[in-house]
Amino acid sequence: MAIERTLSIIKPDAVAKNVIGQIYARFEAAGLKIVAARMIHLSRAEAEQFYAVHKERPFFKDLVDFMISGPVMVQALEGENAVLKNRELMGATDPKKAAPGTIRADFADSIDANAVHGSDAAETAQVEVAFFFPGLNIYSR
């Protein structure tokens, strides 16, 4: 099994609910290490750049508006099969379809306010981690 890194964002809805610690506990219980983390309030330009892959999709404006509506907690996670493991922890994008016990089933309100973002592939993860943590701001342990 390969040690990977993935990006996780705890979105404004979950930050506002004060469940960062509960979500972090789930990462750690699953064997994922938090190797970089910071709280930020994204600017419109940053959110548009980060989600540029969705620019032509009908939900793009709503996604950007939501992501700049409050602070987010951004973290790089490291562990065996980190991308897949994080996606399993998150659950389905629509919390109504998310399996019980997943982050979205437990903390998300809607398909838009769905608590967390996670990289969808190892290649995407590299780009996303570098977007928020350029240079040597990651500390493997």
Swiss-Prot record:
Positions of the catalytic residues: H117
EC nos: 2.7.4.6
Chief localisation class: cytoplasm
Subcellular location, record wording: Cytoplasm
InterPro entries, per the entry: NDK-like_dom, NDK-like_dom_sf, Nucleoside_diP_kinase
Superkingdom of the organism of origin: Bacteria
Classification via PROSITE patterns: NDPK_LIKE (PS51374)
Cofactor: Mg(2+)
UniProt cross-references to Pfam families, sorted A to Z: NDK
Keywords per UniProt: ATP-binding, Cytoplasm, Kinase, Magnesium, Metal-binding, Nucleotide metabolism, Nucleotide-binding, Phosphoprotein, Transferase
GO molecular function, one term: metal ion binding
GO biological process: CTP biosynthetic process; GTP biosynthetic process; UTP biosynthetic process
Residues given in the record as ATP binding sites: K11, F59, R87, T93, R104, N114
CDD domains: NDPk_I
GO cellular component terms listed in the entry, alphabetical order: cytoplasm
Gene3D superfamilies linked to this entry: Nucleoside diphosphate kinase-like domain
Primary role: Major role in the synthesis of nucleoside triphosphates other than ATP. The ATP gamma phosphate is transferred to the NDP beta phosphate via a ping-pong mechanism, using a phosphorylated active-site intermediate.
Entry's family note: Belongs to the NDK family.
Subunit annotation: Homotetramer.
Protein name: Nucleoside diphosphate kinase
Lineage, top ranks: Bacteria, Pseudomonadati, Pseudomonadota, Betaproteobacteria, Burkholderiales
